[in-house]
Amino acid sequence: MKYVKIEEIKGYEDARINVGTADAEEMLDSKTALRMFAVNSEPGEDVEAWVKVQKVIESIGRSNGYIEVEDDHWTQAMKNKKKGAAQVLGINCPQILENFDALVSDEVPVKKMKQSINE
């Protein structure tokens, strides 16, 4: 399995996101994945992570697509279909959601994500 590394996220430098299918050609590089998540996100609170995950899966065009998130601090990789994957991202990697806009562009983002994650 091929993982997508997300090096820019402080505190989650070793986190990896694998979007798509088991075919390596279908995998997204981190910049593309982050950009797709950010561009396709919609305003909301609890639904933000789910919208991002679903949009990426839909854009890949695979109904059996999944997102695998693996962190060296966890005992094993977590594989979840669709909404489960969003919950893993939103609950266990809040910095990923908080930093999308800053990571995908050198320009100041036009649309800021709502502060929906309480620390």
What are these regions (language model features)?
Residues M1-E119:
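Positively charged, low-complexity terminal tracts
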